[in-house]
């Protein structure tokens, strides 16, 4: 029995290691390409999947990779800031992600508390219908939302980016589940002491809900930081691009500046890695606990 268990553990570890290698290889490839001097691939032209290359340049897409022989340089990272308004794109992305996250924390918590504690006609039916909207693909609402933003004149503005994203069904569901797990006696004690429902919400419920709020904030911020489709629709001026949209700036009809694109991608990814490493415990613990309560 112990021998079978040991073999099973070995197989499991091998599978996990292989999965980790496969998952990390694209990031490793991006990091190496971002450090490869531009002169080593400046004659490498990409058109779709076809690659035309003149020696002695390095082919970034050859297997096994041959770019390990190129001397590493940080020049590509410097050039990203010189040839594009990358600093402005960082600012745009931070503003976009921060405003959307703040909106979700406010409205999702209020909506979740309403469904968890307030009594109103057909509350459970409304909540079921509300959850049913999760089955509607997000792409279905893209055109209506875009038309509304165009009518309001919010294209190429921060308003157009964050207003349609200020709340979401998943966030309300997450907060509602967490609120359902809070003992009612705590709120009733506050009400007996003379606290209004609003004061009870802010002084009792929200402080207890910091783990769920933290998890929701991380989830929304990371998702918004990596959002591509909506910023692509709402921004046409280079100065209003977010980081995800700006990556396409390094590609033309005949040439892709892979070193610059990968350098920009690495700089875009690093903040998210740091956030996950710092808050991974709260994120995982809260994701498990709040998802099963109520």
Briefly describe each language-model feature range.
Residues 2-4, 8-294:
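A structural signal for multi-pass alpha-helical bundles of membrane permease subunits
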């Amino acid at each position: 029995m112990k021998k079978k268990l040991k073999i099973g553990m070995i197989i499991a570890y091998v599978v996990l290691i292989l999965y980790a290698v496969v998952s990390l290889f694209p990031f490793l490839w991006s990091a190496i390409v971002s450090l490869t001097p531009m002169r080593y691939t400046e004659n490498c032209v990409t058109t779709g999947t076809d690659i035309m290359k003149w020696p002695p340049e390095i082919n970034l897409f050859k297997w096994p990779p041959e770019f390990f022989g190129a001397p590493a340089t940080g020049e590509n990272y410097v050039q990203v800031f010189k040839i594009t308004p990358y600093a402005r794109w960082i600012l745009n992305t931070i503003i976009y992600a921060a405003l959307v996250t703040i909106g979700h924390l406010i409205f999702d918590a209020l909506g979740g508390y309403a469904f968890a504690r307030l009594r109103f006609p057909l509350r459970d039916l409304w909540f079921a219908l509300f959850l049913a909207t999760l089955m509607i693909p997000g792409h279905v609402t893209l055109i209506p939302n875009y038309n509304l933003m165009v009518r309001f004149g919010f294209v190429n503005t921060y308003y157009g980016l964050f207003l349609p994203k200020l709340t979401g069904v998943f966030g309300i569901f997450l907060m509602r589940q967490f609120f359902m797990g809070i003992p009612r006696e705590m709120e009733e004690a506050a009400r007996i002491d003379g606290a209004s429902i609003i004061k009870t919400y802010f002084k009792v419920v929200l402080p207890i809900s910091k783990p769920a709020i933290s998890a929701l904030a991380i989830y929304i911020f990371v998702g918004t930081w990596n959002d591509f489709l909506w910023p692509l629709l709402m921004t046409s001026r280079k100065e209003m691009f977010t980081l995800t949209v700006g990556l396409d700036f390094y590609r033309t009809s005949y040439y892709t500046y892979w070193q610059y694109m990968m350098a920009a991608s690495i700089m875009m990814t690093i903040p998210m890695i740091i956030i996950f490493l710092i808050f991974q415990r709260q994120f995982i613990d809260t994701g498990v606990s709040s998802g099963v309560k109520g």
